A protein has these predicted regions:
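Short, conserved active-site loop motifs that form the nucleotide-linked donor/cofactor pocket
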Residues: 196
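Class I S-adenosyl-L-methionine
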Residues: 2-184, 202, 275-282
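Short, surface-exposed beta-edge/turn micro-motifs
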Residues: 308-309, 397-401
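Sequence-specific dsDNA recognition surfaces
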Residues: 235-237, 382, 409-427
Length: 427
């Protein structure tokens, strides 16, 4: 869940979403902003009085400017409120550390749109776990370069001053919500300071602040860059020089550029960054000038996304990567690497203890070893496009048996239940 399971506002939001579905409301950006603004008004201490706010009868003082930026045209908002007053009768309460504003926004946004932009919102438990691994007393100046509605920044401990918190994103509505979240987290904050620190900018091409001690976040995964964007990035970043540009690789490269010496980078990333060939450029960069302080394997953590993810915490040492002191955690164990290991950009394999590593090294170095490379053929499994049409439970003279991945076990295969006439031109 994006928020904690005991978030009291969840029930309220579920009622709102049910009403929206019942009324078949077209969820435009403006309409979503009205729902978020209504909630924000109540979190600042007002009851469900959104229409009265739009009429100018009530105020939240210096933060009116932040709420107005989210609402936009007041008359259009009033027209919508008058047409659907029940939507604005729900009561929300302020719960520290819960990004209910962000949850309303992401719940209303179209899932297809989020996928196109590579923005899958990070569950709060993942955010808290990432932050728990940081050195809180020495965080210094903190940046989330893809801050969305500000959930990572909300989870920072109270000891981190607003003066040291920065965030940027290309989603204008998300930035307006993040500013409101910062105003709620720091009730005495200056509006100008919030707006200067939380900005709507492209981190890769427009954001020019540097000298950060800590950079945190969940960069976009698989963002669909335009051809124009690719050309700009290719001229600037080594990780964008290949045929396909992976957004999170470029985010890592840029983040390392603007960290202070020995600064910390902590990102939520797909596990593929450690071993897939397409990401070898970023692994080469990491090998040349950083060390891995902590690596946590989380498995599948995002709703509707089958992609194992990791928490990767780096230190920008400016020196070749050292494995000594690296903390490794997965769902079954946690251990520290105490020895220097040979690491190559082709594959970052840190998921073994020192004892296991020594055994494998001994095997490789003491006896003749044969590898699968150059001794095996690799192929993609059959994709028929229509299993009901092409698969059959009956074996014929011309059919072949079909094995699924789950049918292949150690030392045996499961009984064959399906058959296929292999005519690939029909698939």
């Amino acid at each position: 869940s994006y928020v904690s399971q005991n978030c009291k506002n969840l029930t309220v939001l579920q009622k709102l979403l049910s009403e929206i579905t019942w009324e078949q409301i077209l969820l435009t950006s403006d309409v979503i902003s009205y729902f978020v603004a209504d909630c924000a008004l109540q979190l600042f201490g007002q009851k469900p009085l959104f229409f009265q706010y739009l009429q100018g009868k009530i105020s939240i003082g210096k933060y009116d400017i932040l709420l107005d930026a989210l609402i936009g045209d007041r008359q259009r908002a009033m027209d919508f409120c008058q047409k659907y007053p029940a939507f604005f009768a729900h009561e929300y309460i302020w719960e520290p550390g819960e990004d209910i504003l962000g949850l309303i926004y992401l719940s209303c946004k179209n899932m297809g749109s989020r996928k196109a932009h590579g923005s899958y919102y990070t569950p709060t438990k993942v955010v808290k776990k990432l932050i728990s691994h940081l050195d809180i007393e020495h965080m210094g100046k903190v940046l989330d370069p893809c801050c969305g509605t500000g959930n990572f920044l909300l989870q920072l401990p109270e000891s981190v001053d607003l003066a040291d918190i920065y965030g940027t994103d290309t989603d204008a509505v998300s930035i307006r919500i993040a500013r409101l979240n910062m105003a709620l987290k720091y009730p005495d904050a200056d509006v100008e300071e919030i707006c200067e620190h939380i900005t709507e900018k492209n981190f890769l091409t427009e954001y020019d602040r540097t000298g950060f001690d800590t950079i945190i976040g969940n960069p976009p995964w698989g963002y669909a860059f335009s051809n124009e964007d690719k050309a700009v990035l290719k001229a600037r970043y080594a990780t964008a020089s290949g045929r396909n540009t992976e957004s999170y690789d470029v985010f890592i490269e840029r983040a390392l550029e603007i960290l202070v010496p020995d600064g910390t980078l902590a990102f939520v990333l797909p596990e593929a960054v450690l071993n897939v060939k397409a990401h070898m450029r970023i692994r080469t960069i990491l090998l040349q000038g950083s060390s891995v302080k902590s690596l946590t394997f989380l498995g599948d953590m995002f709703d509707g996304v089958q992609c194992p993810c990791i928490l990767l915490q780096l230190v920008a040492t400016g020196k070749p990567l050292s494995t000594v002191g690296m903390r490794i955690e997965d769902r079954t164990r946690t251990f520290i690497i105490a020895m220097e290991r040979t690491v190559v950009p082709e594959n970052f394999s840190f998921r073994m203890t020192d004892e296991e590593y020594r055994v494998l090294e001994k095997i490789k170095n003491s006896i003749p070893v044969c590898y699968l490379a150059d001794h095996a053929d690799f192929a993609l499994g059959i994709v028929t496009g229509n299993n009901k049409k092409f698969l059959s439970a009956e074996k014929t003279e011309h059919s072949e048996m079909v094995l699924k991945g789950t049918d292949i076990c150690k030392y045996h295969i499961n009984p064959v239940k399906q058959y296929l006439r292999f005519e690939p031109e029909q698939f």
